[in-house]
Amino acid sequence: MAFKIKRGDKVKVLAGKDRGKISTVEFLDSKSGKAIVKNINIAKKHVKAIEGRREGGIYEIELPMPISKVMLVCPKCEKPTRVGFRIEEKDGVVRKYRYCKKCNENIDLVYEKNKVKR
């Protein structure tokens, strides 16, 4: 399944305790459809010490959240937006772009390949 967000994208949280916050995507799990967003959805984990290996205590970890709960912030217009895909063909090269549906500007290049001549 192709996601409309990538690692490193700036996103806005739409639901949950961190609703309205803007941060960057650190990890995407395509199998479960979840993302880990920096400093969002933080939980405390109680960890027992293991002698010689790790120190015990209470650690804060970022939990994954469903991708449907975040929305990409367009780098051009700086607004949360839906994302579309656009395919352009020029000089025998096919390029696929992600684009902002609010300002209609290309966000980035998804892939580029030469068109096969038959």
UniProtKB/Swiss-Prot annotation:
Tell me which InterPro entries the record gives: Rib_uL2_dom2 (IPR014722), Ribosomal_uL24 (IPR003256), Ribosomal_uL24_KOW (IPR041988), Translation_prot_SH3-like_sf (IPR008991)
Name the GO cellular-component terms: ribonucleoprotein complex; ribosome
Q: Which CDD domains match?
A: KOW_RPL26
Q: Which residues form a coiled coil?
A: none
Keywords carried by this UniProt record: Ribonucleoprotein, Ribosomal protein, RNA-binding, rRNA-binding
Q: Name one GO biological process term.
A: translation
Q: How does it assemble?
A: Part of the 50S ribosomal subunit.
The similarity annotation says: Belongs to the universal ribosomal protein uL24 family.
Protein name from the UniProt record: Large ribosomal subunit protein uL24
Source species of the chain = Hydrogenobaculum sp. (strain Y04AAS1)
- What would be the name of the gene that encodes this protein? rplX
